Amino acid sequence: MPELAFPETGEVKTITTDCECSTDFVERSEKDILIAELNNKPSATLADYEESEPGPVVSKRKEKVVDLERKYEKLEERLFSFKNIASNDSLVAFYTRFPNYQTVMALYDFLNPGEHGENINYWLSGKNVDSTPKSMKQERPMTLKPVDEFFLTLCRLRQGFAEVHLAHLFNISQPTVSRIFISWVNFMYLKLGHIDIWPSRELTNATMPEDFKAKYATIRVIIDCTEVRCEMPSSLLLNSELFSSYKHHTTLKALVGISPKAFFTFIGQLYTDGISDREILERSGFLNLPFSNGDSVMADKGFTIEDILLLGVSLNIPPFLGMSDQMSAEDVIATQEIASLRIHVERATNKVKKFRIFDGVIPFSLFGIVNQMWSVVQYTGPHNQCLNCIIFEFNDGII
């Protein structure tokens, strides 16, 4: 019990009080308490506040909140995000190489990363975040929305932006950019890799251009090797394996195949440039493709592979000079015809290099996902027939 002292008399008395503690205060919301403090009414409730006229302090604070919300909306509009460029087709094409917002979203919906990116195995410092329980994974803090992570990935592939530049654009850290890019490239590679891009003989015939029908109607695929430049290693041994005398630079080399209609139908992995055309064809899995009897393959002179092609599959390459001093008129015509048709595969690979990440020098930091990137840019290019079908389906026949 509390005691009260009286100095004048020297008495000390014990004071008893009967009071009942109310829980009303505990049950009030934080908003009730704040309003009560602002109006100097300790017992005020939200209902009391709503019935009364707001005080000048409350009015000022309300005005400040409204002003801050307006400023926030304006700042959000100035952020670099896919939402803020979606209505501008030229910007969408510049950053993603897709013609419009609908096309990008058709691919995004096909990939289906999940509302919060829960379908993606996020990479982090060499460890896969998928080892984390799914409940924890779904609650991870998202720096960017999944659609903006997708946009960031397309920006880097299309324009070849450096990580530090993307970090500045999206207002995130450079390691976060790296984590997002690696995760999304692997995710896209796995999803798109399930698409069968090898067309049937019937589809090849149905889409055969007139240029081929006269003399090369049996062509199933046109193959060629292409190179992309990579960072020069400090190791002399590795440097010698990567160096290309043709490009005068260290390069990686891949086998690609297109249909007569100029769609990619085979995407090989990247190898060191020291590998021969014959060896890269044997190691790439090209010989395991389901050819039909009577098919033919068109290639350059370097592909002396007729002896290793499947039974019933022939090879169309420019004729060799042999022991003669000059070619016959027939051989010259055949060389010119094949060269004029093979130009389509060179044009297709040049379109891939319009994704500027492959137009420049591939850094060592991306060697771990270079094959995934190589496949993704070919699957997502406008020259890919299967991607066009995906876009057509998800756009309800718009394209």
Describe each model-derived feature in a short phrase.
Residues 145-160:
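Short, amphipathic alpha-helical "recognition" segments used to contact nucleic acids or chromatin
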Residues 78-79, 137-139, 148-151, 235, ...:
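Short, flexible segments with low predicted structural confidence
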Residues 24-27, 57-60, 66-67, 74, ...:
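General helical secondary-structure elements
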Residues 2-144:
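Charged, often Cys/His-bearing segments associated with DNA-binding zinc-finger transcription factors
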Residues 1, 64, 100-103, 148, ...:
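Alpha-helical interaction elements in eukaryotic regulators
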Residues 2-3, 159-399:
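Short, well-ordered secondary-structure "scaffold" segments embedded in the functional core
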